[in-house]
Amino acid sequence: MSARSAALVFASVLSAALVLMSVPVAAQVRTAFPEKRGFKLTDFPRTVKLADNVYGYEDIRQPGFTTVSLFVVGNDGVLIADGQGSVEAMKKMLGEIAKVTSKPVKWYIVGSDHGDHTAGNSLLPPDVTYVVTPFSKGQLKLSAPAMAGDKQVINVGGIEVQALYLGRAHTGGDLVVYLPKQKILFMSEVFLNRVFPAMRSAYPTEWVGVIDKALKLDVDRFVPGHGFIEEPKASREELIEYQKALRAVIAEVNRLHQAGLSAEDAAKQADWGPYKEWFLVEQQGPIAVRKVYEEIEGKLK
């Protein structure tokens, strides 16, 4: 090939590359529906590396969205924050952790005490150290000691992990898990990414305030308890959107309550706006109405 021909080929390749660079990359679809996100069931479980020795874990649960766990690999052991919703699912998770490290599980943080995060905990080592709020200890009937305050620091073999109680939110005992050096906050069920606010055990208005506290922490990446793990910028945007969803649900239910509707009629007439497209809206919408009615009427304990 002559020098002139080579130059023409190079110019052609460079021009094509510049054209490709100018075409915007399709934005990641923001949804909790796996198929809309481009996933197949066979893509799960997924282990997502968040930082050196820090991993998110997503697996599909019924009725078809993800439950998310966190695990941290230290020099001498592993910390898990939230498990999965059955013995079978937890066995699968422990198997995936074993692909990353042969170190034993030494610590377990109860982010949520609900069964979809704890039903497989019988597979944890008998000498595992639990980190749990007094409320969740009571719910799970654990013999392990509860946290004495709102913060417990765990040294996971050289990695600082903080279990933080920011207040009542999805339950009365939610813990979030903060890694200050990595600027990661695993939020358990305080953050349900693109999943309609699930309020069976919730404190709706307090939940909004807990997210305010989370947003004030020095965090680059917020990791949800359900829905998909996002890249850092999108994770903050989605947490803010989730807080907007909570506020919208509370406002709409207050409107219906002021109109004199019963909770049953309010659930039928509620207009959830853009959040009607979110996962679980049919199941969780009526529950949210009842819970906000309890809050309005002073019946929330």
List the model feature ranges, each with a label:
Residues 9-22:
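Bacterial N-terminal signal peptides
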Residues 81-83, 106-114, 131-135, 185-188, ...:
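Active-site neighborhood of phospho(di)ester-bond hydrolases with catalytic His/Asp-centered motifs
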Residues 88, 95-156:
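Active-site HxH/HxHxD metal-binding segment of metal-dependent hydrolases
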Residues 31, 49, 133-167, 171-173, ...:
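Metallo-beta-lactamase
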Residues 208-261, 265:
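Divalent-metal (often Zn2+) His-rich catalytic cores of metallo-beta-lactamase-fold enzymes
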Residues 258-301:
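C-terminal regulatory/interaction regions
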